[in-house]
Amino acid sequence: MRSVSVGEVARRDVITGSPTETAVEIAYKMREHGIGSVVIVNEKDEPIGIITERDLVIKVVSQGKNPDEVIARDIMSQPVITVEEDMEVNEAVKLMVDKGIRRLPIVDDNGKLIGIVTMQDILQVEPYLVATIEEEMKKFQEELEELEEVSEIIEGVCDLCETYSEELRFVDGVWVCPECYEDILGREIEDRELEE
């Protein structure tokens, strides 16, 4: 079976923004074009970040910030992970799963943005990759479960009590706030004592 490159399934009409655009302007672009992300580029059209709907909710709305005063540079995810258009789609899927992302900006040899590919784009042309994704996700989950916790702390909504926290930790396959984390630790200690 011939391998397909990301360049063959990529969208070429990428909606971009500048680092100085406001959150309102970015949100308007998403709504206007029916998309879930905007790639932030510099004056050379090189991708320097990406803003998703989730970024707007977590970094602006949930913190009560005025979206007219928040600029893209302050809320974009960076550095942005990019690929070249000759990368095979199965490699792109593995990269997405490994990094926990759903879209990859595509750049040319000079680092200039020329397209974007999403997990959905790939699965529409290569549905057989669903099995690959599931396999990679399982490996990823197993690796996470081997760790008692991931040292990275993020902000967001706790998967257990559903309250907003700036100190979420990934434990036992879920993002938890400090209070729920203490509860989990307490349960583990009790379980160990019962086993002894």
Swiss-Prot record:
Domain CBS, residue spans: 10-69, 76-132
Keyword annotations of the record: CBS domain, Iron, Metal-binding, Repeat, Zinc
Entry superkingdom: Archaea
SMART domains linked to this entry: CBS (SM00116)
Any coiled-coil regions, as ranges: none
Binding site for Fe cation: C158, C161, C177, C180
A GO molecular-function descriptor: metal ion binding
Classification via InterPro entries: ACP_MB, CBS_dom, CBS_dom_sf, Diverse_CBS-Domain
Binding site for Zn(2+): C158, C161, C177, C180
Metal-binding keyword on record: yes
Record-annotated ACP-type MB domain positions: 153-187
UniProt-listed SUPFAM superfamilies: CBS-domain pair
PANTHER family linked to this entry: CBS DOMAIN-CONTAINING PROTEIN, CBS DOMAIN-CONTAINING PROTEIN CBSX3, MITOCHONDRIAL
Stated name of the protein: Uncharacterized protein MK0525
Species annotation: Methanopyrus kandleri (strain AV19 / DSM 6324 / JCM 9639 / NBRC 100938)
UniProt lineage: Archaea, Methanobacteriati, Methanobacteriota, Methanomada group, Methanopyri
